[in-house]
A protein has these predicted regions:
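The Walker A/P-loop phosphate-binding site
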Residues: 2-104, 125-127
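C-terminal regions of RecA-like/P-loop NTPase motor modules
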Residues: 2-12, 111, 128, 145-165, ...
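Cytosolic-facing regulatory segments adjacent to core modules
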Residues: 36, 74-161, 277-278
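Structural motif
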Residues: 51, 137, 163-168, 241
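Conserved H-loop
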Residues: 86-88, 201, 206-208
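Flexible beta-alpha connector loops of hexameric P-loop NTPases
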Residues: 107-114, 136-140, 174-186, 215-225
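Helical hairpin unit composed of two closely spaced alpha helices linked by a short loop
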Residues: 163-202
Length: 297
């Protein structure tokens, strides 16, 4: 059995601590102050797995796409982000990305209802001509762990530095048919973590939430047990955030709801406190911006 001496561990920890004190970030920022703070201060750390979960229409895919756009803006030439979409076409995802990045209504892009300035700003801007080149967008209805591992190894072989991997949605991943679905998902997450540690990238996954939340008496706030195939998922990840929009869910203490509000409720934080994060969403442009409050719960 291999072990690491306490002195070595202390040396590593103080090296990281000195970087944090000096303001050197070890993680990859989400673009949202409150989310980064909840994740430990530096954003998404390599080797860690974060889940954004919610019922259909709540915005789990939307928050993952907004984080993706924010991170694309920060990439160096050799760095890439991987986004695997299992439910939407790559065309739909790209349209949503363009709407977020350029703050243009999604229906204008979908219907071609753009003025000359809007069209030129997209075609000639640095986002489409440079930053978007760092996106590896994969459309697959049921990718397997082997598919993802092959993609990772091929990108590294090409000299790319992978900063993050996003899977939307976790439940659509193909798992070993000889075991239960939740066991298969847990095994897949375990193997992805190994690759994430080896190649130093973070993992973001979106997850479905059981319909039983809709029929629950009282506040309809999901719990870890409401994650689909949840028996082992919650044990295998580091952070779980449930995405809620008060106009759909009853939130305790809120008599009036604002239609552009979005809440991230942290139900698992392996390394810190649970938080409630308020964000603001514009569904026309698909853009999510920082809210006003950050509350420890």
């Amino acid at each position: 059995m291999k072990y690491t001496s306490t002195k070595t561990l202390l040396d590593i920890e103080f090296e990281h601590l000195n970087k944090r004190v000096a303001g050197v970030k070890t993680g990859f920022t989400s673009g949202y102050i409150a989310i980064d703070k909840s994740l430990g201060g530096s954003g998404f750390e390599p080797g860690l797995i974060t889940v954004f979960a919610g019922r259909p229409g709540m915005g789990s895919s939307l928050i993952s796409l907004n984080v993706l756009v924010n991170q694309l803006m920060q990439l160096n030439d050799s760095e890439v982000l991987i986004y695997i979409t299992t439910k939407d076409s790559s065309t739909v995802i790209l349209q949503r990305i363009l709407a977020i990045a350029h703050d243009i209504e999604i229906t204008k892009i979908q219907n071609g209802d753009l003025n000359v300035h809007e069209l030129n700003s997209m075609q000639d801007g640095s986002f489409c001509n440079k930053k978007l080149h760092g996106l590896v967008l994969v459309e697959h209805p049921s990718p397997s762990i082997e598919d993802m591992q092959n993609l990772l190894f091929n990108l590294v072989k090409e000299g790319k530095s992978i900063r993050s991997l996003t899977i939307d949605t976790l439940q659509n991943v193909k798992t070993d048919s000889s075991i239960t679905k939740d066991q298969g998902v847990a095994q897949m997450l375990k193997e992805l973590r190994v690759a994430a540690i080896q190649f130093q990238f973070s993992i973001i996954v979106t997850s479905e939430v059981s319909r039983r939340v809709e029929y629950r008496d009282g506040p309809k706030i999901p719990q870890l047990k409401d994650l689909k195939d949840s028996r082992l998922i919650a044990d295998k990840v580091d952070f779980v955030y449930f995405v809620l929009r008060p106009m759909y869910y009853e939130v305790p203490g809120e008599d009036e709801t604002i239609s552009d509000e979005m809440h991230l409720i942290c139900k698992k934080n392996k390394y810190g406190p649970l938080d409630l994060i308020d964000l603001t969403v514009d569904l026309k442009t698909q853009r999510i911006t920082n809210g006003l409050t950050f509350t420890k719960i």
